[in-house]
Amino acid sequence: MTQAEIVKCLREEYEIEHNKDQKPEKEDLPAITKKFYQRVLELLTIHKVPYSKQEDEETYEEYLLSDTEESGNKKKKQQGKLKNQDSDDEDVEARIASIKNKLRQKKGPTTERQQKRRESKKLKRSKGVQKLLLSSAKNLKNENVKHQKLKNGVVKSEQETEDSKEQIQPVKVQPVYNQEAKIVYSKVDFAANPGGKAKKSHQNPKEILKKLRDTKKHLTELREQGETDKAAEIQTDIAWRNAFDKVEGKKVKDDTKLLQKAIKKRRVEKKKSKTKWTERKQKVEHDKEKRQKKRQENLEKRSKDKKNRKLKTASKRGRIIPGY
């Protein structure tokens, strides 16, 4: 049974029990209403009518018969409109869902292969990946060029070594004999440490020049005295020593002109550094004095401001101070 039928039945029963023509007295109204409510409750419980969820005025009116046909028609129209709106909303939602599905089908790749292709294209389009690809390509190119150069260099070096080996001939050492016809063994071994580090020569050119001058003076004195053999022997010793130094990799500094040049250069550099140092010292002292002066001025200013403030406060309180 519908709600309208239930209400109709209630109305008929009410009309049967209470005649329409008879008007109830004022005293019997509360008792009649009580009985009517009890009857309605019994009917509702018998027919198992559910409670309405919406507690609006329209829902209560649905259980009652309409007084006029117009109001009933209006309600029906409103219900029809609501139903139509619901159906329209459902149709719109269904259409939106179908469009979304179509778009997904278009966008989404059908196979894994297509998906991988799209991902690779996206990666290629991105700027960061393009930069990486370019840099990697350049690195590969550089590595290939280096590899080829190394190969060419190795081949050339091998050829050069082979040529040098062919050119090198074994040195035949001939024994040296003295006056007594005995073999003299050299005390100097030239190939003792061919790959060793070169020893550093004396660095101070002033001392080297002084030493050279002293030796020259000594040689001239010997020649003047008539000891030419001794002078020649000393000269040969010096020549041999220089030769051995050159073999060991030392720098032989026996040119007086170059030594004088080096001394002059050192003197100029020393002078330059001295002037720079004095300028730096003066600048440091000047900056120091400037900072101290500024600090002193700030301290004096602060003390003056403090005094002025105190004098002002005193004058405001009523003390007579000259100048305020």
From Swiss-Prot:
Gene Ontology cellular component annotations, sorted alphabetically: nucleolus
InterPro entries reported in the protein's UniProt record: Rrp14/SURF6_C (IPR029190), SURF6 (IPR007019)
Residue ranges with Basic residues bias: 115-128, 264-275, 304-324
Principal place of residence: nucleus
Keywords: Nucleus, Phosphoprotein
UniProt KW Nucleus keyword: yes
Alphabetical list of Pfam families matching this protein: SURF6
Region (Disordered): 53-167, 264-324
Modified residues (Phosphoserine): S87
UniProt-listed GO biological process terms: ribosomal large subunit biogenesis; ribosomal small subunit biogenesis; ribosome biogenesis; ventral cord development
Biased composition (Basic and acidic residues): 157-166, 276-303
Localisation: Nucleus, Nucleolus
One GO MF term: nucleic acid binding
PANTHER family: SURFEIT LOCUS PROTEIN 6 (PTHR14369:SF0)
Record function comment: Involved in a nucleolar function.
Family under the similarity heading: Belongs to the SURF6 family.
Protein name per Swiss-Prot or TrEMBL: Surfeit locus protein 6 homolog
Organism: Drosophila melanogaster (Fruit fly)
Name of the gene encoding the protein in the UniProt record: Surf6
